[in-house]
From Swiss-Prot:
The keyword Transmembrane helix does not apply. This is Uncharacterized glycosyl hydrolase MJ1610. GO terms for biological process: carbohydrate metabolic process. Its EC number is 3.2.1.-. Belongs to the glycosyl hydrolase 15 family. The active site is at D403 (proton acceptor), E406 (proton donor). GO terms for molecular function: hydrolase activity, hydrolyzing O-glycosyl compounds.
Amino acid sequence: MIYMGGIVGNNSLLAKIGDYGEIEYLFYPQVGYETHFFDSALAVYDKKVKWHWDDDWDITQKYIEETNIFKTILEDDKIILTIKDFVPVSHNVLIRRVYIKNKLDKKLNFKLFFYENLRIGENPITNTVKFLEDGCIVKYNGKYIFCIGSDKRIDSFQCGNRYSKTSAYIDIENGILKEHKESSGLLTDSAISWNIKIDEKRSLAFNIYILPQRFDGDFSIITEQLKIIMNNSENIKNLSMNYWKHIIGEINRFIHPELRQNNKIYSITKRALMTLLMLCDKEGGIIAAPSLHPDYRYVWGRDGSYISIALDLFGIRNIPDRFFEFMSKIQNADGSWLQNYYVNGKPRLTAIQTDQIGSILWAMDVHYRLTGDRKFVERYWNTIEKAANYLRLVALNFTPCFDLWEERFGVFAYTMGATYAGLKCAYSMSKAVNKRDKVKDWGKTIEFLKHEVPKRFYLEDEERFAKSINPLDKTIDTSILGLSYPFNLIDVDDERMIKTAEAIEKAFKYKVGGIGRYPEDIYFGGNPWIITTLWLSLYYRRLYKVLKEKDDNGADIYLQKSKKLFNWVMKYSFDGLFPEQIHKELGVPMSAMPLGWSNAMFLIYVYENDKVIIP
């Protein structure tokens, strides 16, 4: 079995599909907010019940190439049950296309059940589940309503309470639904069933529709909407297919022809981009990951900046622009941003991580350099100026803050690199709006950092750079690479930086390989990360290019190192999805998957022409 799971969505509705093909939860009406725990299940009843999580299914999962349709195949000795999940670009509905194939040389008769134990909203309250004469189930509270229907006639139903005798779950275990039409409570559940009859070696298919809306007390609005979607399902699907085809076509313009010759890299590149698009909300926020454990369904300026850059590099310009508009609206009066936000713009964690401020300015400058759009700089100049002025004060005072890993407080190498890059990018953009003369202090601060940071962070005895000063932390940490890549405060071929990178490489001895954050890491047990492995790979590739330009005979070894690390990352792509971490012993995904930053770093590597992102 391939333990993977996936996501499907548009810019308002995002669904997480679990390892067994179950719907774990939905985000609606925005990507990442609110959370609706679905707890769905499929079951087959043929004299006894067989749930989709039972051991004797052979389960595989994958995306259909060049689409955001996620396919789960459950196979046993009698049937092949295939579920194709997708959310169309035009409608906020999850469509589950169910295919059932009879493998035997005889006719099959059994029941198929769809079960839900949906908890609506961030703070679930009493809700009601009801079977309507229209042939669908509705579940609602005072704010939202969900409608579950099918284009195949429903043969039976049950509305009950999960931990009571009326539970639809218990009914499925018995194979007969009681057909109670309504139930209210905190933990209502429901089920619908179909009597399946399939001739030998034949197949049948039908759709299950899950439609969420805001609720004003009128059932007819959502039931009419469901009918429209059901009657036009093929057109809705074709519209989405054409949209995805257009996206891939645009991406192809920015992928080097040689890259397209490597089918695996090309396939992962397309999937990584399409995955990032599903993390982008219609209001401009970009969530770090569609994950609840750990809870990453929020907007971090850092993660959003890396994702914006990745999208920009491959020609997707409107989403980064929308992200910058979102960040501009929520910027603090002093020019800073808080640690993270809900996608509706409300603050969640209120600490300051200065590196995020620098990252946002860096991403804005990359966008400007790729587009040459001076009006973009004019539109956001107030945002840029406030952020740069904040960074200048931080830089001159070496002001401490929380590190990018959100674990420690101090003055960090990565943070100072991001501060330098943010100031340099703001200074660069000032020329586009004829403001260079008014921001000369930024230029002086850039030179100050260029001189002071290497001097203050260098450890003479260890012959490498420190993780932080004030307090001094000599820990070998992969984020120190940020001083050079991507932020360019220290030259990539500076001998001190090379020795720092080599110390990082030697510090990790995981059974499965890869590079972690720092050797003493205990988060999820301390594992190799996708972003840190790519980070060192990117640094080595950049070093190779610089040394090659200088005809240095030692350049090739760094290209070999870079490729080895990149190949490790390729090995741990799960049908194009990258997690945050890989288990150091088992080689399975750990923590959030997909993680936006992991996918973005892969795309930055694949783009190859890193000059455009170096400040």
